[in-house]
Amino acid sequence: MKPFAAAFTASMMCCTSALADVPSLAVDANIVFLGEVHDNPNHHETQADWIAALQPAALVFEMIAPDVASGLSAADRADSETLGKALGWAGSGWPDFAMYAPLFSSAPNARIYGAAVPRSMARQILSDGLSVAMTLEDRQRFGLERDLPAAQQAAREAHQMAAHCDALPEDLMPGMVLIQRVRDAWLAQQALAALQDTGGPVVVITGNGHARRDWGAPAAIAQADTTVAVYALGQSEDGAAQSGAFDHVVDAPAAERPDPCAAFK
């Protein structure tokens, strides 16, 4: 087990010039989104470097439920093994916690917030509507009460179909897009709450799709509060164009992974 204090010290020793490598717009932002391809360790190394440089007052994670994050104690964050167990990471379905642990240790004093939409709630949204996820006030605040423009709805449905290897029925796509919009709104809600609670800056750890400025959580924040300065970093693989609008995109080698569509064949 590696104490987080030692990990933080090592991180700062290796990254004393890291702030110079972070764009000034990110340094000055209230909320910084750090996108990722979830299983790419290179992307998590970049995130850890940016977090070490920015030293945010709060970290918001797509992967953690709000109640789990709020229940973390200082003892839970004593080392990576203890933290992983406190988060219930092993049974969460997310990639190896070893890739995510440095994100916590790079800012050991940051408050942790969670924005994960429970799977049970996602299913309930499809059957019972958005009221199970947010109040009417918040749905209006983050734009969930408005239909998307037709072109954006079609693009989002195509994106979801491609992400699922063109293997799912088309009539499921509108519901999947709706769930993604709810996840964007939850990320935005938690990021704004973290900013209000701590004064910022706030760093949000999430997939590239939720970090994009044009229709991800940054767009939901812009709907809610135009005075909040947001910066969005996307991360690509092997030089491939990254879908969506970002303030900056960092490229890295692709992670070694099996064919994600093999299960559908």
What are these regions (language model features)?
Residues 30-32, 57, 200-206, 230:
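Generic beta-sheet signal
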Residues 42, 46, 66-75:
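Membrane-embedded segments
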Residues 59-65, 231-235:
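Short internal beta-strands
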Residues 22-54:
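Zymogen propeptides
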Residues 186, 192-195, 203, 210-265:
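C-terminal regions of proteins
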Residues 72-194:
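A substrate-binding/cap region within the structured catalytic cores of diverse enzymes
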Residues 37-40, 64-68, 118-122, 208-212, ...:
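Solvent-exposed loop/turn segments at secondary-structure junctions
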Residues 4-30:
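N- or domain-start disorder-to-order transition segments that initiate the globular core
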